[in-house]
Amino acid sequence: MRWLKALAIGFGALLGLLVAVPFLVPLEHYLPAIERQVSERLGERVKIGALRATLLPVPQLAVREIEAGERGDIRVSKVIVTPDFWSLLGSPKVIRSVEIEGLEATPGALGRLASRKPAADRGEVRAVVVQSVRLTSARLRLERAALGPFDAEIALAADGAFSSATLRTADGKLVAEVRPAQGGFFVEARARGWTLPAGPPIVFDELRLKGIAHAEEASFKEIHAKLYGGNVNGQARLRWRKGIELSGSAAVNGVELRSLAPLIAQHARVSGRLTARPVFRAFAAEAAQLASALRLETPFEVQDGVLYGVDIGRAASLIASRQENSPGGQTRFDELSGHLVLERRAYRFTKLKIASGALAADGHVSVSPEQELSGRIHAKIKAASVTAATVPLNVSGTVQAPVLLPTAGYVAGAAAGTAILGPGLGTTIGATISTTLGRLFGGESAEEKKAPER
């Protein structure tokens, strides 16, 4: 929070100059000198749009349309400085309050200002004491989104040093406390009914996090969330010195996928309660590119759910009995497990296992960034009307319209068995031999073989 104090002191110092200036004199004449002084204090180029001083009902200085930084990456609509009038005649000058309205800044800009040493550390005489600072309608500006608006109350010690700050979103759903710690700032945040302001609009029933923020990184060792009927506990680190780097891990338990899955992966249609242990990392030049650069890996298990848009059991039973399969339907399961690798918007599901009553299936499926499917599922149906056989199904189509078709080897084996031994038993024996030989001689994909065990 050093940058807030520096900003307040910079404008507060101007009041000492303005005491001797008649209030009817246009203050725009003094803008170049004022901009120069504030720039020197902040260590950033500063541009001011307008100044106005008033005596009644209390002496105040209003500064409007402020830009700081070479690219204007700090912007303020208005700053109102209210001094202790009589202190302006002596030293130090006391500023009762500084109100900053409509602040917009990038993380990098705030990091630059926060890294500046306060005047006392640089051996300068402290000529201005600020008693309180308040922000309204502030926003943290990202490349394609903004965090906020939020309000903040900043408490200062008797010597003007930063003591603590409380930040609240305009709707009151998120509250954060900040105070100095370990050469940076300790951050503790709490939220209820809060929606992510950037990225997928995930809604948190409850969110609590604790961590330490520095000028170029923030590390959160405790993250606890309740969402979609389950909970997530984890840790994360965000760095922004050269580009944006995000890393972390989490434990996910009992999260219902029906509403959450489409928010994370477009067109994903699945329900059930998820258990997972993801480890993730992303590095990008800009924050907006993080999603595309994300790499996530996790074992997973989904209980009591449904895969919508495809009926694996029906496809396997119809093909096994030599009937034509039609697309669509759904696959209910007691348990779906496997291993997921997400990398640059492509999903690889390996070590897949599906269990549900008469259905047992395993295999691997990949989803391209364009939502195209590829892979193979081996399905086995236990039914009185059909002799049990494992049916290998090639997976194709898209996430919206998946297609399951028997492999060429399975079709050929089933046809040969039928020709030699007749339909029914002959078909099953021929198909089984073909499937077994296929698995023995290269039937599994390389990615399925190399996937780590759970």
Task: Provide a role label for each language-model segment.
Residues K117-L207, R344:
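Elongated, acidic membrane-bridging lipid-handling scaffolds
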Residues K5-I66, R71:
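N-terminal amphipathic/hydrophobic interface segments
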